Amino acid sequence: MRLKHPTARLALAALLVAVPRSVAAAGTVHAAPAPAGATRLAAVGLDDPHKKDIAMQLVSSAENSSLDWKSQYKYIEDIKDGRGYTAGIIGFCSGTGDMLDLVADYTDLKPGNILAKYLPALRKVNGTESHAGLASAFEKDWATAAKDSVFQQAQNDERDRSYFNPAVNQAKASLRALGQFAYYDAIVMHGPGDSSDSFGGIRKAAMKKAKTPAQGRDEATYLKAFLAARKTVMLKEEAHSDTSRVDTEQTVFLNAKNFDLNPPLKWKVYGDSYAINS
């Protein structure tokens, strides 16, 4: 994932790593109140189409300083973060593998497309910041491909497969839409691995501080621990040192107890104000 704002950077490679879901707390012989997480089952999750669109707008406000995420299919540039080109709706990167996967999938769907000829170059530059075999011609052809609905769908599919679905699936057992979004935004920026600075590491650090709702702890306490763990990781890197997407976005929703992420929503990212009214 890319961050176009000068204080932010792209996420790590999109290599799916399964993270175990929390196990629900066992019941007792005597009747007892259900854990806070149990009430979430009746709520609308982030995979609801409208909620998903809200999530994309929230991410786009930080990534592109715009709520119009559907205008980002054509986006491509080198943001000088050591990961080569950053492009598309969630910043697929030539240096981290997900751009290669995307173009390969697009070619499976539409052989002979305008980007297919760059697959050999994308394989060579994977893991580097190099533009070898790409450069301005690739940028132009990417923008052309972005007009193709098949390529747009390929971007949507790669987003879901590598970022959105893993985040939501790992949150569903315990967290409502806000918590699911917190996972998604984290996996977008930090990658889905298990290292201490990845989503998996952040989640593990949070769970050492607070149990999940499925384990009997209230949702707010766990989410505060998760956001605090994420901030700790962000502050270790200069490129992530502006933590406003946590402080003046997600924490604002949490303090308002808007666990279902219901509009109207008002927040700030990097000092810019945004609103979703419906």
From Swiss-Prot:
<keyword id="KW-0732">Signal</keyword>
<dbReference type="InterPro" id="IPR000400">
    <property type="entry name" value="Glyco_hydro_46"/>
</dbReference>
<feature type="active site" description="Proton donor">
    <location>
        <position position="63"/>
    </location>
</feature>
<dbReference type="Pfam" id="PF01374">
    <property type="entry name" value="Glyco_hydro_46"/>
</dbReference>
<dbReference type="GO" id="GO:0005576">
    <property type="term" value="C:extracellular region"/>
</dbReference>
<protein>
    <recommendedName>
        <fullName>Chitosanase</fullName>
        <ecNumber>3.2.1.132</ecNumber>
    </recommendedName>
</protein>
<feature type="signal peptide">
    <location>
        <begin position="1"/>
        <end position="41"/>
    </location>
</feature>
<dbReference type="GO" id="GO:0005975">
    <property type="term" value="P:carbohydrate metabolic process"/>
</dbReference>
<feature type="active site" description="Nucleophile">
    <location>
        <position position="81"/>
    </location>
</feature>
<dbReference type="InterPro" id="IPR023099">
    <property type="entry name" value="Glyco_hydro_46_N"/>
</dbReference>
<dbReference type="GO" id="GO:0016977">
    <property type="term" value="F:chitosanase activity"/>
</dbReference>
<keyword id="KW-0326">Glycosidase</keyword>
<keyword id="KW-0964">Secreted</keyword>
<comment type="function">
    <text>Aids in the defense against invading fungal pathogens by degrading their cell wall chitosan.</text>
</comment>
<keyword id="KW-0378">Hydrolase</keyword>
<comment type="similarity">
    <text>Belongs to the glycosyl hydrolase 46 family.</text>
</comment>
<dbReference type="InterPro" id="IPR023346">
    <property type="entry name" value="Lysozyme-like_dom_sf"/>
</dbReference>
